[in-house]
């Protein structure tokens, strides 16, 4: 009568899949319309000239040009713009 005592349970053993967030195109780099610039949760970066924002707060280029990051305003908001080349 070979019996095996029940193994103990554990509270570990799971992890969420990474969401691949962050800046995809950096300042000074060339970009084409429709390309993703930043994937983010909330508005860490705000859209400036030539940049649109998706429903998940993804920033994307609306025009072709060069990416520019800048800090503006009294609250020190970070803006991303696309300067036409």
Swiss-Prot record:
One GO term (biological process): translation
Matching InterPro entries: Ribosomal_bL27, Ribosomal_bL27_CS
Mitochondrion listed as a keyword: no
PROSITE patterns tied to this protein: RIBOSOMAL_L27 (PS00831)
Pfam families: Ribosomal_L27 (PF01016)
Molecular function as annotated in GO: structural constituent of ribosome
GO cellular component terms, A-Z: cytosolic large ribosomal subunit
Keywords: Ribonucleoprotein, Ribosomal protein
Renumbered residue ranges of the record's region Disordered: 1-20
Similarity comment text for this entry: Belongs to the bacterial ribosomal protein bL27 family.
Protein's name according to its UniProt entry: Large ribosomal subunit protein bL27
Lineage: Bacteria, Pseudomonadati, Pseudomonadota, Gammaproteobacteria, Pseudomonadales
Gene, per the UniProt record: rpmA
């Amino acid at each position: 009568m070979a019996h095996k005592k029940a193994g103990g349970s554990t509270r570990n053993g799971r992890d969420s899949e990474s969401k691949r967030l962050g800046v995809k195109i950096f300042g000074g780099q060339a970009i084409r319309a429709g390309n993703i610039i930043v994937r983010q949760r909330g508005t860490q970066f705000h859209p400036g000239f030539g940049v649109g924002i998706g429903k998940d707060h993804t920033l994307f280029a609306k025009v072709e040009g060069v990416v520019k990051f800048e800090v503006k305003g009294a609250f020190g908001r970070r803006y991303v713009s696309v300067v036409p080349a």
